[in-house]
Regions:
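Short acidic alpha-helical/loop segments enriched in Asp/Glu that coordinate divalent cations
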Residues: 1-2, 47, 61-68, 79-84
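Catalytic core of tubulin tyrosine ligase-like
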Residues: 167
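Conserved small/polar residues in nucleotide/adenosyl-binding loops
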Residues: 178-184
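Short, flexible active-site recognition loops that position polar ligands and cofactors
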Residues: 150-161
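Short acidic (Asp/Glu) and glycine-rich catalytic loops that position anionic groups and cofactors
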Residues: 7-13, 46-49, 93-100, 143-149
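Generic, well-ordered alpha-helical scaffold segments in large soluble proteins
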Residues: 31-35, 49-57, 68, 72, ...
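Gly/Thr-rich phosphate-binding loop signature of adenosyl cofactor/nucleotide-binding cores
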Residues: 1-48, 57-60, 88
Length: 184
């Protein structure tokens, strides 16, 4: 829908670069991006999560992020790729908004941190209690586990809860604007 065309006009290049390079401070996002860059493949749920994160947490325009991922997927199929991107980024106006929480996804799909530790070696010594949110480690633990947050591995570049709240307000506002009955 054209109603959504200009909602993400202020493209944040720094967020885009961090997302592309697996440097967001969200371990599963970073592991997926690094795995994709190295192998050309990640499963459907992880693809959906990457799009959700780029679209809602980073508020990046789906047209730019979709072009980048199209160059990374070895199984790229335009007819599937672009329609999925539009749906996952909430710009169709007909699908419900699907926002994936990267910490919850990691707990559900990499509960032991095996995938994350493989693709984000900076976190290989981080214990399970912090593998989902390494930025919550104390400075002492960061030293013990050889992972200084902000130096070896980034702080989360955005606050997931805050960004999702903003995204929902904007997107639901557009939906209400175009679905509310007109005054008589």
């Amino acid at each position: 829908s054209h109603s959504y065309d200009s909602i993400r006009d202020n493209f944040n290049e720094a967020y885009f670069i961090a997302w592309k390079n697996g440097q967001t401070g969200y371990p599963l996002i970073d592991a997926c991006m690094r795995c994709l860059k190295a192998t050309g493949y990640i499963n459907f749920r992880m693809r959906a999560m990457l799009v959700s994160f780029a679209s809602y947490d980073l508020w990046l325009d789906w047209r730019k992020t979709s072009k980048y991922l199209a160059t990374q997927f070895t199984d790229y199929e335009p007819g599937i790729h672009y329609s999925q991107f539009q749906m996952q980024s909430g710009v169709t106006g007909i699908n419900s908004i699907r926002i994936y929480n990267p910490v919850k996804q990691q707990k559900d799909h990499d509960g032991e941190g095996i995938f994350v530790r493989e693709w984000v070696p900076e976190l290989k010594e981080v214990p399970l209690e912090y593998i989902f949110t390494p930025h919550l480690m104390s400075e002492g633990f960061q030293e013990i586990y050889n992972c200084k947050i902000g130096t070896d591995y980034p702080e989360p570049i955005v606050d997931h809860g805050l960004q999702v709240k903003k995204a929902k307000q904007i997107l639901y506002g557009i939906c209400l604007l175009y679905t509310s009955p007109s005054p008589r």
